[in-house]
C-alpha cells in the first residue's frame, strides 16, 4: 500500500505554477502557505508576484513579528521608510538573497521582474496590517493612486542614485 510522503519539497516547477497563478489573478500575486492554519506559531509562505502588483508600505508592530524573506527567483525592491515616508534604506534582492525586517520597521516591497517568487517566514498568528501599521503616506490597495504609488516604489528601488533621504511623495503624501 502506497502512502503519501510527509516531507514536502518545492522547486522550479512549483515556483513556475505559483507564478502562473499570480499572473492570472487581479492582485497579480499569489501565496502558498506551508503552515496548517492562520493561528500557527510560525508562518512559512511562498509568494509569487508580478511587476504590476502593489503592496502598501507597512510595518508589523507586534514585537515578535520580525519578517525574513528569501528571494527564490526574479528580483524584488525593498525600501525602508520613516513614518513621514522618507527613504532610510533601499535594497534590490535577487535569487538566494535574504532580507530580515525587524518588527516595527516601515517597509515597502515591489516586484522588479516577472514571475518573482520569494519565501517568507514570520511569527503567527496572522494579523493583516491595520491602522498605524499601514503607511499613512501611501494609498491602501484598491484606493485611487495605487498605480502612481507602485511607480514611485519602483523608481525609488531602481534609482541610479541612492534615494536615501527622498520622500515617497505618493498621492496621499
Model-identified regions with their sequence ranges:
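A short, N-terminal "cap"/entry segment at the start of jelly-roll beta-barrel domains
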Residues: 1-43, 56, 91, 146-173
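His/acidic/aromatic-lined binding-pocket segments of jelly-roll/cupin-type domains
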Residues: 46-47, 66-71, 99, 109
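Conserved short histidine dyad/triad with adjacent acidic residue
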Residues: 46-64
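Glycine- and acidic-residue-biased ligand/ion/polar-headgroup-sensing regions
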Residues: 50, 64-81
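Short beta-strand His + acidic residue motifs that chelate non-heme Fe in jelly-roll/DSBH
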Residues: 57, 78-80, 99-101, 107-112, ...
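Short, surface-exposed beta-strand-loop junctions and turns on beta-sheet-rich folds
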Residues: 62-64, 84-86, 125-126
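Short acidic-glycine-tyrosine-enriched beta hairpin
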Residues: 82-104
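Double-stranded beta-helix
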Residues: 108-173
